[in-house]
Design a protein with these regions (language model features):
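A hydrophobic, multi-pass inner-membrane permease signature
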Residues: 1-204
Length: 204
């Protein structure tokens, strides 16, 4: 409602659920600005890459950890869950990205976050509770490999969890703001969220 209300009504805090003083000048300004249009398509493109890579990494980690036959799976699960509880801090992280030449690039917003311990835990739990071992054992007896079982049996039966995590990854990346603010300085590489913030502050 505020986006199509007059600035006077917004500043006076008169807008709640219904627009007052209908005004679309802000939308006209945004869509006439080539930078914002570019940032929107760039953000969609980056979110798609992030979501696909995140699902691939999450699946590759969760599937083997869901199998009882994997030796040391408890240890590996513990190691992979550590980032969920501890963070290196902003300055060490910034220096690491600098040494890896990731600063001011699209990949600094993708690679560090494609592995999510939380999403991996959800997918691992789904595999353990919803995919019976007998189904995979039957496939092994028929000569199927681990990859064939994963792609031809497990993933087709896991559409619900894949759709859920796809939503988690996509919404999480789309709403992320702080990392772009810390690590991106080039305007053409800024996602739409950061550019809109700059636009609001009069920096564009």
């Amino acid at each position: 409602a505020k986006s199509v209300s007059s600035s006077n009504a917004v500043m006076a805090k008169e807008v709640y659920f219904v627009a007052k003083g209908f005004n679309i000048s802000m939308y006209e300004t945004i869509f006439k600005d080539g930078q914002l249009i570019h940032a929107m398509f760039y953000s969609v493109y980056m979110t798609m890459i992030f979501t696909v890579l995140g699902l691939v990494v999450c699946t590759c980690a969760a599937y083997p950890l869901s199998k009882k036959r994997l030796k040391g799976r408890t240890f590996f699960s513990f190691i992979l869950m550590i980032p969920m509880y501890f963070s290196a801090g902003l300055i060490p992280t910034y220096l690491l990205y600098k040494d890896l030449n990731l600063l001011d690039s699209m990949w600094v917003l993708i690679l560090p976050l494609i592995f999510s311990p939380y999403n991996m835990l959800i997918m691992r739990s789904f595999f353990q509770s919803s995919i019976p071992d007998s189904l995979e054992e039957s496939a092994f007896l028929d000569g199927a490999t681990n990859f064939q079982i994963l792609f031809r049996i497990v993933l087709p039966l896991s559409k619900s969890i894949i759709a859920t995590l796809l939503l988690f990854y996509a919404v999480g990346r789309w709403n992320a703001f702080a990392d772009a603010q810390y690590y991106i300085t080039t305007k053409s590489l800024k996602p739409i969220q950061l550019l809109l913030s700059d636009f609001e502050r009069g920096r564009v």
